[in-house]
Amino acid sequence: MKTTDLKSIKSIVLSFLYFDIEETEFSPIIVTHPIFESGIVMLPNSNKPYNILEDEDAYNEIIECYKNRIKKANSIDTLFYMIRKSYKLTFIKFIEKYLSIEDLSTLLAEAWTSSENPNQDVNVSLTQLTRMFKKTNKKYLMTEEEYEIYNNLPETFTVYRGVASGRNPKGMSWTQSLEVAKWFSNRFNYGNKGYIQQATANKKDVLAYFNRRDEDEIVINVKNLNDICIL
């Protein structure tokens, strides 16, 4: 049975650590980086904040601090939670070959359900996501309650997808709840109108069922849906 290769994964976390810190309109408070959420950090043995965008010594010290944390990490969870939510799916794409099936399953579920918009991750295609979901063990991918609901899905059933303005109509997140789809169709619209898609799904094509955010979510590749229409 394949086990998780922590040594190889640590080297990838280190490479993520050295990504350039990109500024945003809210910098230094908010930055774009796989690990750092802010350019303002607290250093060990110090009680004042430092701006690592301007202070090279502070930047080097915080990098050394993280390098030591990565080196001392003794579990995949410790490494995984160093990565920001918006980068977790990308991280999994890079470490997938070093993960046990159990760890791939639990981490993919966490990354998917914690991401604000996993269907439009520019670094991970829907084809790659589908392949990763197919590799998982569904008993580890889902909670006991989710797995029970998944097992009891009918052979064919109706699903909906709320598509807000500017969002991907071919995403993998669908739901059995029309009310949930309505909510998503109006999310982030800012005055523009979204819409609801309806389709027929086959149980054999369902990649996962998640309800940890009360969204009654059916994860399925849109290519496997039938009778897609707009309500």
Predicted regions, residues:
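Conserved NAD+-utilizing ADP-ribose enzyme module
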Residues: 1-157, 164-172, 178-231
